[in-house]
């Protein structure tokens, strides 16, 4: 799967205040609109709740044949036999996660400094940001200049994350990205299908999708 990884429209999903039914409907409509990969990010749930929700999201992703990743929790990814995991700089090292998960799983890594490119061995893609301030990333923004430098030097695909919406996609035009990761632009939209469809159109207009 990692050799055919479509990162173009990457959805980072959290249930938040939505009912489970509403949450899953939002994800399904987003997939129909063009989301190509989903990462389940649940900081507030305990392991058992995370696992149970993960089973349902995984079933949905399998039905539409898109990759399903878990944020941070290698143990949950293993328990679910998810397609992979996304790790932050303070999470388990990539080489250890790779040893646990095996060669066929997808591992993404958050990165925001050029010097961190020296330590990405074993990762399949990078998530770089935040591009704009968000409720979860209020500080430590990544400049577009630095994002562009990281994209040009990275041997693996790079996804921009953090406050990305349709307007931001115009600012990202020409940067050597493999895709963008969104949260609120889809999860808070009145119509997740239309939101995803419009984002996908803008992605194809503005990004080379290397």
UniProtKB/Swiss-Prot annotation:
One annotated GO molecular function is: thiamine-phosphate diphosphorylase activity
Which N-terminal residues, if any, form the signal peptide?
none
Per the record, the GO terms for biological process are:
thiamine biosynthetic process; thiamine diphosphate biosynthetic process
**Residues the entry annotates as binding 2-[(2R,5Z)-2-carboxy-4-methylthiazol-5(2H)-ylidene]ethyl phosphate:** 134-136, 163
Species annotation: Campylobacter jejuni subsp. jejuni serotype O:23/36 (strain 81-176)
Question: Could you tell me what this protein is called?
Answer: Thiamine-phosphate synthase
Q: SUPFAM superfamilies given for it? A: Thiamin phosphate synthase
One cellular component (GO) term of this entry: cytoplasm
Reactions catalysed according to its record = 2-[(2R,5Z)-2-carboxy-4-methylthiazol-5(2H)-ylidene]ethyl phosphate + 4-amino-2-methyl-5-(diphosphooxymethyl)pyrimidine + 2 H(+) = thiamine phosphate + CO2 + diphosphate; 2-(2-carboxy-4-methylthiazol-5-yl)ethyl phosphate + 4-amino-2-methyl-5-(diphosphooxymethyl)pyrimidine + 2 H(+) = thiamine phosphate + CO2 + diphosphate; 4-methyl-5-(2-phosphooxyethyl)-thiazole + 4-amino-2-methyl-5-(diphosphooxymethyl)pyrimidine + H(+) = thiamine phosphate + diphosphate
What does this protein's UniProt record list under function?
Answer: Condenses 4-methyl-5-(beta-hydroxyethyl)thiazole monophosphate (THZ-P) and 2-methyl-4-amino-5-hydroxymethyl pyrimidine pyrophosphate (HMP-PP) to form thiamine monophosphate (TMP).
